[in-house]
Amino acid sequence: ETFATFAVFNHKHMEAKERFKVVYSADATEFLQRLTSKAREKIISNARKASYTIDPKLFKKLTGTDLWELEINDGKQYRLLAFWDKTKEVDTLVIASHGFIKKTDKTPAKEIERANKIMKEYFEFK
């Protein structure tokens, strides 16, 4: 199952108020583990920054979808697709569905379909 395991990376507390917590699905965790430690650390750092600031260079909504894209450019265009879970009273979660290396200007339809499938499974089995 996609959501059998989750990895929640501890983000150090910053002075600003955290707007959401990032949760990485098994697929996203697997993607991160395949990367170099430098790329992985940059992605996790940018996810932490995005949770405290509104920066469309880091985290932006994909037009016409319920998905968001976390962008990291480090020689390659790393992307994590994500969706919001606002059903908890205390924490707002952003679930990183999976990651990929972007090779074109547009986000490939197959990656959007994959994220939508993971999102559907997440809310069905939650």
Give the location of each predicted region:
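Basic, Lys/Arg-enriched alpha-helical interface segments
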Residues: 1-78, 86-94, 100-126
